[in-house]
Amino acid sequence: MEQPSGRKLAITNLMMLSVAMLWGVAWPVGRILAVDLVDYPFSVMFLRYSFALPVLFVWMWYREGNTIPKQEDWKPLFLMAFTSVFLYQVGYMFGMQRTAASDASLVIGFNPVFVAILSIWLLSHRMNSGGIIGICLSFTGILLIFLASPNVQIPFEERIAGNSLIMFGAFVYAIYVISMRGYILERGEDQLSSLSLIAWVSLIGCIFFIPFVINEAPWDRVWINEEWLLIAYLGVLSTAVAYVFFAIGVDVIGANRASSFVNVVPVFGILSSWFLLDEELGWIQLVSFVLIYFGVRMVNAQPPEGMKNPK
C-alpha cells in the first residue's frame, strides 16, 4: 500500500474518528426511537434503510457504474442481508426497547469474539492460547455490564433481556461476517466490490421488513419532525455516510488500522448516552470497556483465516 501524505492521513484519521462518533451516537438515538415508537419497530428499521439506500447506490454508481450482481451472487447476498440487516436490526431495535444505550454499546463489542469462535468451525482458524484468554477477558467484561450496570433506573430483568437481544444481534452479525469472508474467498477476483456488496445487501434486507411494516400500518400514525430527523440520522449518517467513510479509510490506511477506530465506538456511545439520555456513568463501564477492548485485541491477533478443504 502506497504511503499517504501527511495531510491525507490526517483527513482520513479524522474521517475514521467521525465514523466512530456516528456509530456511537446511534445507540442513544436508537434508544429514543425504540422507546417512543415501541409499536412500530419494523417501520423504523425499514425507514432507516430507505434513507440509507439512495446514498449507497448513488455512491456506488459514481464510483463503479451500474453494478448488477450475477446469478451466483444472489444466494450469498440473501444470506448476508437476512443476517446483517434483518436479524441484526431485530436484535438492535427490540434490545434498545429494554436496555440502556450505553450498556448496549459495550455489549455489541463482543461481535469480533463471536466471529473468532464461529471461524473455528466454519473457517480454518486455529485459536491459540492468547485468543482463548482474549475470549475470557471479553466475556468477563460483558458479564460485568450484564450483572452490575450502573443504569439501575431500568429494571434488572429488562436490562438482561435487552442485553441478550443485543448479544443476539452481535451473533447474527458474526454469521454475516463469516459468510462474507466465505463469499470473498470462494469468488476471488470475480466478487462484488465491498461497496456494491453493502448496497445490494441493504436493499435486499430492506425488502425483508415490508410484510412486518404492512402489519404495523405506520401510515395510520402522525410522525413528528424529530422522529424523522432521528431516523434520517440512523439511515443517512450512521449507516450510509459512516460506511462510505469507513471504506475510504480502509483504502487509505488499511483494514487493521481502520478497524482499530471501531474499538472506541463504546466511548462515544457511553458519553452520548449520558449527554442525551442522562444515563449513568460508572467505573463498571470503564472496567467492562477495558476488558472487552483488550480481549478483542487478543482475539484479533490470530493467524489468518482460510476456507476449509472439502472432505
Residue ranges and their predicted role:
Residues 37-87, 114, 171-179, 198-217, ...:
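Transmembrane alpha-helices of multi-pass small-molecule transport proteins
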Residues 56, 78, 127-149, 263, ...:
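Hydrophobic transmembrane alpha-helices of multi-pass small-molecule transport proteins
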Residues 8-12, 37-42, 46, 69-75, ...:
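Juxtamembrane helix-entry segments on the extracytoplasmic side of multipass membrane proteins
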Residues 1-46, 152-185, 207, 272, ...:
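Glycine-/small-residue-enriched transmembrane alpha-helix faces in small-molecule transporters
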Residues 33, 44, 48, 95, ...:
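Hydrophobic/aromatic residues within transmembrane alpha-helices
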Residues 19, 44-47, 85, 89, ...:
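Helix-helix packing/entry segments at the starts of transmembrane helices
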Residues 26-27, 57-108, 144, 235-253:
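Specific transmembrane alpha-helical segments of multi-pass solute transporters/efflux pumps
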Residues 26, 51-55, 107-121, 136, ...:
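Alpha-helical transmembrane segments of compact multi-pass small-molecule transporters, enriched
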